[in-house]
A protein has these predicted regions:
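Bacterial N-terminal signal peptides that target proteins for export
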Residues: 1-9
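Bacterial N-terminal signal peptides
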Residues: 8-17
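Bulky hydrophobic segments
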Residues: 21-231, 250-419
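Divalent metal-coordination and catalytic microenvironments
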Residues: 214, 238, 244
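Long, internal stretches of domain cores in catalytic or enzyme-like folds
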Residues: 226, 241-248
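A glycine-rich, coil/turn loop motif that links secondary-structure elements
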Residues: 231-237
Length: 419
């Protein structure tokens, strides 16, 4: 959960006037080869060969610089600005499937898509929020969409530079963040294999970018000065949602269903909704009941945003295998027996392959997070032999485990209950 929706306090009115139209920021076309044209003319033959993409026509996409506001875990939370409670305000996070709006690449805080450009049968904003699924636990739609867009934003640059030493700069948090691509012999890869390797690298690195954000939040990074984001660090639904976004766009890239922004936006919208249905999404009233059932266990409704320990349960298990936090019969207990039917489905565990075409992906590209001196003291709980000013994504799981130990000690000292 990387941007708390406190900005809704002052953007709700403004957003009404920020309606715009979708536009194609990129549109490329596959080309038939001369052999395919000759075969067609000579014998009216059809071919199963894919048309090719001219590298000189690759769009100059980048990772989006603007990010979506996302949800603090819980429902109808109170908010404080400094020591002052915001009167008569509660943060309403929960949405349901029918309310989800059309996707927009790099939408930032707000974007309106007209119905003529939408594949969902209706226009509107993305209308992000959280919802509960029986097989995937809570899903934060802003996290899904951000990592989806990061995957898309990385793909063509990775594809164009595959096999070469290359650096891709990312928005800074704690310090510079970037992707280091290593030089290797890619001459034996076919065009289809290069496409597949680049697609998997893009999804994997976009996901690790999300992991680096969780680390940055825990160690003091904040999007807005004076508004701490420690409440959001390692929130239990974040990384599963991020990986879902990476997998959605990995699937679209593999099927070449993202060659224009319009096509990309429409297909993300369709596959996101289909994925939520497969995960067993419930309606808004049921999601609210689930949040109420885990109040005092996973979050504390008596605390206000941005108090870190409004969130009681966190997810520190980083890596390319993500298991969701879901209801269990034991968690619900007798007092929530009416929700036991939501705790019966098996979990869907998400994974991102570590190797493709016999290539170890971590050996050919790494995500790097550098720590500026102003944040170095926030890493004092971690032995120096484990971290340095430069942290690679393969070290992220160890960094997170030290955060888990530190949080456990703080919660015990504060007598904060975590069940």
């Amino acid at each position: 959960m990387n941007r708390i929706l406190f900005i809704s306090l002052y953007t709700a009115t403004l957003c009404t006037f920020l309606a715009g139209c979708s536009s194609d920021n990129w549109a490329i076309h596959a080309m038939p080869s001369s052999n395919q044209a000759a075969d067609m003319l000579a014998g009216d033959l059809t071919t199963n060969q894919n048309w090719y993409l001219d590298e000189s026509r690759y769009p100059q996409l980048t990772v989006p610089q603007n990010v979506r506001p996302c949800c603090a875990f819980g429902d109808m939370q109170k908010v404080k600005i400094g020591p002052v409670p915001v009167p008569f305000f509660r943060l309403n996070n929960v949405v349901e499937l029918e309310e989800i709006g059309p996707h927009k690449f790099a939408s930032g805080i707000y974007h309106y898509t007209p119905s003529s450009s939408s594949a969902l049968g209706h226009g509107g904003s993305e209308n992000n929020g959280i919802l509960y699924t029986q097989k995937g636990g809570f899903i934060d739609l802003a996290h899904v969409r951000d990592t989806a867009d990061d995957t898309m934003g990385l793909f063509f640059e990775i594809l164009a530079n595959l096999g070469q030493a290359h650096r891709i700069d990312l928005p800074a948090e704690l310090g510079p963040r970037y992707i280091e691509m290593a030089s290797f012999d890619a001459s034996s890869l076919t065009d289809e294999q290069r496409w597949s390797v680049a697609a998997h690298l893009s999804a994997r690195l976009a996901y690790f970018k999300a992991e680096s954000h969780e680390i940055a939040q825990w160690h003091g990074y904040a999007s807005f000065s004076g508004w701490p984001e420690t409440i959001s660090a390692y929130s239990l639904e974040d990384l599963y949602s991020n990986m879902l976004g990476a997998k959605i766009v990995l699937n679209l890239i593999q099927q070449h269903k993202m060659l224009s922004e319009r096509e990309y936006n429409q297909n993300v919208s369709l596959l996101l909704n289909a994925s939520l249905q497969e995960l067993g999404v419930v309606d808004k009233s049921q999601s609210k009941l689930v949040l109420a059932a885990v109040d005092g266990k996973w979050w504390n409704s008596h605390e206000s945003i941005p108090n870190k320990y409004m969130v009681l349960q966190r997810h520190y298990d980083l890596g390319d295998i993500q298991t969701p936090h879901r209801l269990t019969p034991e968690l619900l207990g007798k007092e929530n027996s009416n929700l036991q039917y939501l705790a019966q489905s098996p979990a869907i565990v998400l994974t991102l392959p570590a190797s493709v075409e016999s290539l170890d992906l971590d050996n050919i590209a790494k995500l790097v997070l550098e720590v500026a001196p102003s944040y170095a003291d926030n890493f004092n709980h971690i032995p120096k032999r484990i971290w340095s000013e430069r942290i690679e994504h393969t070290q992220f799981p160890v960094i997170a485990k030290y955060a888990e130990l530190q949080d456990g000690q703080e919660m015990k000292a504060l007598d904060v209950t975590e069940k």
